[in-house]
Amino acid sequence: MKRCIVILVLVLLSVAMQAQKFPSWLAGKWEIPSVSMFSDSSFEDWIEVSKNHLESRTYRKFGDDTMYFDSMSMSIEKGNVVLKMYGEKDGKRFMADFIGKRLADEVWVFECAESDSPSAIYYQKLSDNEVYVWTEVRNDSYVCSDFIMYRR
C-alpha cells in the first residue's frame, strides 16, 4: 500500500512539474491591436494539440479576406521547449528552432543562435488575458518589436 501511495505521489509531482515546464497558458486566440488607424488588429491563434504541443498562426483580417503572416509550433523535444518558426539570416528566411527557457514563473525566452531576426522572442504573462511579447535582433538593419496580446 505504501508503495502505491509513493508511486502515485511521484506521478502527480511529475505531472505538476511538467505543467510548469511548458507555457500552456498561451493556448487560445490573442488579439494584437494595430497602432495605426489605417489597419485592423492582427491575431495569434495558439491551438493545444496535446498537453505539451501548441500550434499557432499569425494573421490579419481584411473584411472577408485573411492574410497569414507566420505559422509556429511549440513542443517539448529532447527535454527542451522548442518554438519552431521562420527566422532570417543574411536576408533569407528559414525554419528555425528557438530553444525556450523559463526566466521566471510567467516569463519565457526563445533564442536561436542561427537567426539574425528575430534572435530572441520573449513572452511574459501579465494576466490570464494579457501577454507582453518582445523581440531582439542581432543585426542593426532589422527592427525589434514589442506588443501586448489580449485574449479573445
Predicted regions located by residue number:
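Hydrophobic h-region of N-terminal signal peptides that target proteins for export
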Residues: 10-18
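Central antiparallel beta-sheet cores of small beta-barrel/beta-sandwich binding domains
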Residues: 32-114
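Extended Gly/Ser/Thr-rich low-complexity repeat segments
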Residues: 121-130
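N-terminal helix-cap/turn-to-beta initiation motif at the start of protein domains
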Residues: 17-29
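Sec-dependent signal peptide recognition
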Residues: 2-8
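Edge beta-strand at a domain terminus
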Residues: 93, 97-100, 105, 129-152
